[in-house]
Amino acid sequence: MCGAKSNLCSSKTLTEVEFMRQKSEDGASATCLLEFAACDDLSSFKREIEENPSVEIDESGFWYCRRVGSKKMGFEERTPLMVAAMYGSMEVLNYIIATGRSDVNRVCSDEKVTALHCAVSGCSVSIVEIIKILLDASASPNCVDANGNKPVDLLAKDSRFVPNQSRKAVEVLLTGIHGSVMEEEEEELKSVVTKYPADASLPDINEGVYGTDDFRMFSFKVKPCSRAYSHDWTECPFVHPGENARRRDPRKYPYTCVPCPEFRKGSCPKGDSCEYAHGVFESWLHPAQYRTRLCKDETGCARRVCFFAHRRDELRPVNASTGSAMVSPRSSNQSPEMSVMSPLTLGSSPMNSPMANGVPLSPRNGGLWQNRVNSLTPPPLQLNGSRLKSTLSARDMDMEMELRFRGLDNRRLGDLKPSNLEETFGSYDSASVMQLQSPSRHSQMNHYPSSPVRQPPPHGFESSAAMAAAVMNARSSAFAKRSLSFKPAPVASNVSDWGSPNGKLEWGMQRDELNKLRRSASFGIHGNNNNSVSRPARDYSDEPDVSWVNSLVKENAPERVNERVGNTVNGAASRDKFKLPSWAEQMYIDHEQQIVA
């Protein structure tokens, strides 16, 4: 150790020979003190001083170390106090200062560094205690080295080697600010929080509609706040510019409750179009995850906004197949968007049909009377009154006349309300209603491709649209063309004028109307003999000749028409036997046979 030869060379102009000669002549004892000070060997340090009275405790020697403020290594001139401060040797440092024979502000070599410079550049574990001891020994923190750096300036360069708490303490000690004053300032900075005045108009985010599930899932931190004055964002249920709690509307943006991995890294390139949740609020307030788990604090939860249920009755049901939450009954009852309006509500259009919602058709829920009530009330297009009147068909006119005879006039129908509809139309037999709802009934109607399945109107009236669609379809044009051969004088036939003699817009194959059709056909055959008629009649010269219908009607129609009329009069028990007449098909076949003959 002491006196041993070294092959290391100095970083200065000293050559190896000169360094070894100087060390062997003058610095042998000083080098031993530096080694004892670096190892914090107080007993050896004392023995060396006591055995060699000529050795000064403040004697400098060359020590191989890193230059202060630099990364270069070399032999630098240091005192035992500087080496003890550099390596954090507490016992040796206290002993040297206690002797009073060492200057804590001594400057060595051309670097002009002090013990404080060495203590800061050493970055030892006990750097704070070392600096306190030196400052208590009247060390000056304002001493400047050859590069113009104070000890506190060296801390900024070597701060990565010092723990955060130690760095702050060293900075406080070297800047001359007492710890108590600094602590008071830190407490003041922590206590400086923006306090807003009490705002009575600011709603409570946990009371009323603001605490419901629907508001939390679809409106909380989604809708922008309309308050122009400054207020506490944490107490406001609406979103503000630059707020981290901002959420996307899950009804507008189809994203899931799964956190976005890109958003966690900083920013998502997809923005609002991302299919994952951006942030904690979007993830836990998503309808698929909100209040699907119990809070660990349950009823003792003190959070302002909690994503979990505090009681079991607050848990939202989870779909077993998808794993996501379903609409809670409390939310569906409170939200007007989840409610379904009744089709019998006059003056408004129904949102969903009863069949779509799975509600069976019955007279009490308005399924059988939906078409009739809709014809009396404005449709969803809100057409004006004149256009509605122009769309009334002849069947509606006939129904009005029949209702007048039966005591159900327009005034009574006009006063229909949801309160008295059940009294007016509540006389259906339950057996007939079940027959109308049976699958065989629908399958029987579905085999007619040209007529849609419609519900029969009340009071035994047959559906005009179902019969007209079956008879007056593509074959009506063939009837019009082939009937021209039976006219004495061929005239261009206008299919649009082929109607009932009373001039109504549409008509069904009823018994009384067939008689009218028979008379109108005879007028077309015998010519325009208007003198034999006691009153002016309509000119039927342009209508097609349908005289061949007479024989067909006499042979086939009366029996079947009588049978259908009888079934109609019998009441609602025979409505399940409704089907399109087959005599129309037989009429077409017989007519073609006559043409071929």
From Swiss-Prot:
Keywords: ANK repeat, DNA-binding, Metal-binding, Nucleus, Repeat, Stress response, Zinc, Zinc-finger. Expressed in roots and anthers. PANTHER family: UNKEMPT FAMILY MEMBER (PTHR14493), ZINC FINGER CCCH DOMAIN-CONTAINING PROTEIN 29 (PTHR14493:SF158). It is found in: Nucleus. This is Zinc finger CCCH domain-containing protein 29. It holds the Pfam family zf-CCCH. One of its GO terms (molecular function) is zinc ion binding. Residues 320-337 have a biased composition (Polar residues). The keyword Ligase does not apply. GO terms for cellular component: nucleus. It comes from Arabidopsis thaliana. SUPFAM superfamilies: Ankyrin repeat.
